[in-house]
Amino acid sequence: MLSKTHTKYIQSLQHKKLRDETGLFIAEGPKVVMDLLNSRKFICKEIFALNNWLQEHSKHLSLLKDTVVTEAEDFELQKISSLSTAHAVLAVFEKRKPDYKIETAFKITLVLDTIQDPGNLGTIIRIADWFGIENIVCSTGCADMYNA
């Protein structure tokens, strides 16, 4: 059971200002959460999920260190979700520090300038990932990539 305080805290991470202050962001949905966990590039702080999702992924979750795993009900996930219909899992991850020393030798680097729509930015990132582009640089005028 999520407390009101914790619910409000998770909801506050939907705002860029709080994401920047805390260095945390929310990931929603089974595929996104599992992709981030499997990448081992992001530290997972908390997972909120339905019982059946937790049981299905129990082996993977047992390997996580310092991650608080909380069983949640549908209505609780709906409260903390930014989506109109909540998924079976929502997780809180640490944002990565920007890497200003990008290894560009023999690699394609995608540079984005003033992409202001978070949905468009997310689409570009997913397509770049599909094509194997590892380096993406966003100008200061771009949307928050943790909101894409």
How would you name each of these model-derived features?
Residues M1-S84:
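N-terminal positively charged helical leader segments and presequences
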Residues I26, F48, L90-V92, L110-V111, ...:
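Structural motif
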Residues G29, A91, A128:
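Residue-level signal for inorganic ion chemistry
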Residues P30, N51, A72-D74, F93-K95, ...:
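Fold-independent oxyanion-binding glycine-rich loops
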Residues E56, Q78, P98, D144-M145:
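Flexible, glycine-rich phosphate/dinucleotide-binding loops
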Residues S84-F106, N135-C138:
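Acidic/glycine-rich phosphate/pyrophosphate-binding loops and surrounding catalytic core
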Residues I102-A148:
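RNA substrate-binding interface of SAM-dependent RNA methyltransferases
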